[in-house]
Amino acid sequence: MVKSHIGSWILVLFVAMWSDVGLCKKRPKPGGGWNTGGSRYPGQGSPGGNRYPSQGGGGWGQPHGGGWGQPHGGGWGQPHGGGWGQPHGGGWGQPHGGGGWGQGGTHGQWNKPSKPKTNMKHVAGAAAAGAVVGGLGGYMLGSAMSRPLIHFGNDYEDRYYRENMYRYPNQVYYRPVDQYSNQNNFVHDCVNITVKQHTVTTTTKGENFTETDIKMMERVVEQMCITQYQRESEAYYQRGASVILFSSPPVILLISFLIFLIVG
């Protein structure tokens, strides 16, 4: 008799879960598609100029007026004003100042830094959405993409792009889509950080970009950022649908009752 009841409840649970899945799939996805109403990004019509001006009072990517990537006015990649890669003002590779390289401020421990604790939640989030980039304020690096084939309206620029496209990035930097109100804001920020990071990194290697390069790079990165937004929106929607499914009161009630029957 108990087995008959268990079989009936399993059937009811199966039907309820599939009903909720169907409802979840009908929910609208966040964000719009490419070119769905509204103006495009500010300054796009000016040839040769930067179509993605920085926002706010500081320089590019400066929330509080520091240099590039400086949340509080330190050097590049310095959260609190230390040297490059120095979170708290110590020497390179010194988390809290003092000591020689790799000592972390303690004498007699040459080249034996303490092992950082691993936060499993951060690891899971990075695996789901991309690797978090250190020193870039929570930005993640997307997976490599094929550079899009773009026509710029004249033979010279089309030929120039085909000959130099390998110099432009094939990955973009971005933040989670739930931090933006729409696709335009996501793409604008994605283009700014990606072009700036690629330009700085390449310039340090002795290679410079012309205005034509910057113009083409922005177009290429824009298309890749749109693709990245669509991927992240789909993944965000699927994660939300799963949470809604298993947090539905009827499903919770049925699962609880089924467990009660099995245990009892």
UniProtKB/Swiss-Prot annotation:
Membrane topology listed for this record: Lipid-anchor; GPI-anchor
Propeptide residue range(s): 242-264
Family: Belongs to the prion family.
Protein name: Major prion protein
Residue positions binding Cu(2+) 3: H88, G89, G90
Listed Pfam families: Prion, Prion_bPrPp, Prion_octapep
Binding site for Cu(2+) 1: H72, G73, G74
Organism listed in the record: Tragelaphus imberbis (Lesser kudu)
Chain intervals with Gly residues compositional bias: 55-107
Function: Its primary physiological function is unclear. Has cytoprotective activity against internal or environmental stresses. May play a role in neuronal development and synaptic plasticity. May be required for neuronal myelin sheath maintenance. May play a role in iron uptake and iron homeostasis. Soluble oligomers are toxic to cultured neuroblastoma cells and induce apoptosis (in vitro). Association with GPC1 (via its heparan sulfate chains) targets PRNP to lipid rafts. Also provides Cu(2+) or Zn(2+) for the ascorbate-mediated GPC1 deaminase degradation of its heparan sulfate side chains.
Domain of life (superkingdom): Eukaryota
Binding site for Cu(2+) 2: H80, G81, G82
Disease note: Variations in PRNP are responsible of transmissible bovine spongiform encephalopathies (BSE), a class of neurodegenerative diseases that affect various mammals. These diseases are caused by abnormally folded prion proteins. BSE can be subdivided into at least three groups: classical, H-type and L-type, with the latter 2 collectively referred to as atypical BSE. Susceptibility or resistance to a BSE disease can be influenced by at least 3 factors related to the host prion protein: protein expression levels, number of octapeptide repeats, and specific polymorphisms.
Ranges where the record places region Interaction with GRB2, ERI3 and SYN1: 25-241
Binding site for Cu(2+) 4: H96, G98, G99
UniProt-annotated glycosylation sites, renumbered to this chain: N192, N208
Stretches for region 6 X 8 AA tandem repeats of P-H-G-G-G-W-G-Q: 54-103
SMART domains given in the database record: PRP (SM00157)
Subunit-structure text: Monomer and homodimer. Has a tendency to aggregate into amyloid fibrils containing a cross-beta spine, formed by a steric zipper of superposed beta-strands. Soluble oligomers may represent an intermediate stage on the path to fibril formation. Copper binding may promote oligomerization. Interacts with GRB2, APP, ERI3/PRNPIP and SYN1. Mislocalized cytosolically exposed PrP interacts with MGRN1; this interaction alters MGRN1 subcellular location and causes lysosomal enlargement. Interacts with KIAA1191.
Localization: Cell membrane; Golgi apparatus
GO terms under biological process: protein homooligomerization
